[in-house]
Amino acid sequence: MAIGDRKKIIIDTDPGIDDAMAIFVALNSPEVDVIGLTTIFGNVYTTLATRNALHLLEVAGRTDIPVAEGTHKTFLNDTKLRIADFVHGKDGLGNQNFPPPKGKPIEKSGPEFLVEQAKLCPGEITVVALGPLTNLALAVQLDPEFSKNVGQIVLLGGAFAVNGNVNPASEANIFGDPEAADIVFTCGADIIAVGINVTHQVIMTADDKDKLASSKGKLAQYLCKILDVYYDYHLTAYEIKGVYLHDPATILAAFLPSLFTYTEGVARVQTSGITRGLTLLYNNLKRFEEANEWSDKPTVKVAVTVDAPAVVKLIMDRLMES
């Protein structure tokens, strides 16, 4: 595939074991050109997310890709953050305690980098957001034209018509900064939301892990070092002998959207009470008599089904070919 035909993507990430997998899949996919990583809190604090992003690029031999460190606080400047290190390990990468990366982040912040790149290539950049949506909300605040300049936002977030994974109401990325999520969902950009209603169908089994281990793929071998913590968490939390491929599935939605089907509607996020972080999609099937919080807001696409076997096979193939 010619360089000019490849989709330019920026990955907004909180690495994270499945983030590592998603980044590696993207780097080993000829359909995309990864032009940068921006970092955010979520699976780890932002400082560690930056370190991990730089480390993963070194592992992949792609230190040419810039890393822009994102915000350390929520959109409302809260520094009390929910960190999912119990899922990914204290270091975010399976408690392997890898040596520090040699590289450094660029001077621009994550939101500044997003705004800059969207301005440089209007309509051409896809941002794949794998963590809380704070950097994107700050980009919207920083530049009112960002929503028009960015080509598409493909995000992992929401639990549409299913229970959440933080509590019965909320999915982790949306719960991490509900105010930011609501800003992004209603900003008017071209958005695809991939929620856990879909990603919980995409499972890498223990047998799949064995296939990775027996392959000659360099990145597959690396992942096998860090996956045990992730498998242990899923066995304890969900009683399954496998792991959900949230982030890698979302990466694929950015450049192979036909692997999913979608519905379209207005998505809003609850920002208070016991359902804080709840995502509610209005499907436009009823015309309400009174105006409400969904009225006259831009629509987004939400993934509703997935060809899970095809997604898992593609992820495995890209990793084993690495």
UniProtKB/Swiss-Prot annotation:
> What does induction of this protein depend on?
Accumulates during senescence.
Q: Which InterPro entries match?
A: Inosine/uridine_hydrolase_dom (IPR001910), IUNH (IPR023186), Ribo_hydro-like (IPR036452)
Question: What do mutants without this gene show?
Answer: Normal seedling germination and plant growth and development in standard conditions. No abnormal levels of nucleoside intermediates. The roots of the double mutant urh1 urh2 accumulates strong levels of xanthosine.
What keywords are assigned to this protein?
Answer: Cytoplasm, Glycosidase, Hydrolase
Q: Give GO BP annotations, semicolon-separated.
A: inosine catabolic process; leaf senescence
Entry GO CC: cytosol
**Which branch of life, at top level?**
Eukaryota
Quote the Pfam families the UniProt record gives: IU_nuc_hydro
**GO molecular-function annotation terms?**
inosine nucleosidase activity; protein heterodimerization activity; purine nucleosidase activity; UDP-glucosyltransferase activity; uridine nucleosidase activity; xanthosine nucleotidase activity
What SUPFAM superfamilies does the record tag this protein with?
Nucleoside hydrolase
Provide the reaction this enzyme catalyses.
uridine + H2O = D-ribose + uracil; inosine + H2O = hypoxanthine + D-ribose; xanthosine + H2O = D-ribose + xanthine
The free-text tissue note of the record is: Expressed in roots, seedlings and flowers.
Catalytic residue list: D14, H246
EC code(s) of this entry? 3.2.2.3, 3.2.2.2, 3.2.2.-
Q: Where in the cell is it found?
A: Cytoplasm, Cytosol
Top-rank EC class of the record's enzyme: hydrolase
Q: So what does this one do?
A: Involved in pyrimidine breakdown, especially in response to dark stress. In the presence of URH1, exhibits efficient inosine and xanthosine hydrolytic activities. Support inosine breakdown especially during the late phase of senescence.
Q: Which family does it belong to?
A: Belongs to the IUNH family.
The protein's assembly and partners: Component of the NSH heterocomplex made of URH1/NSH1 and URH2/NSH2 which exhibits strong xanthosine nucleosidase activity. Interacts with URH1.
Q: What is this protein called?
A: Probable uridine nucleosidase 2
Organism in which the protein naturally occurs: Arabidopsis thaliana (Mouse-ear cress)
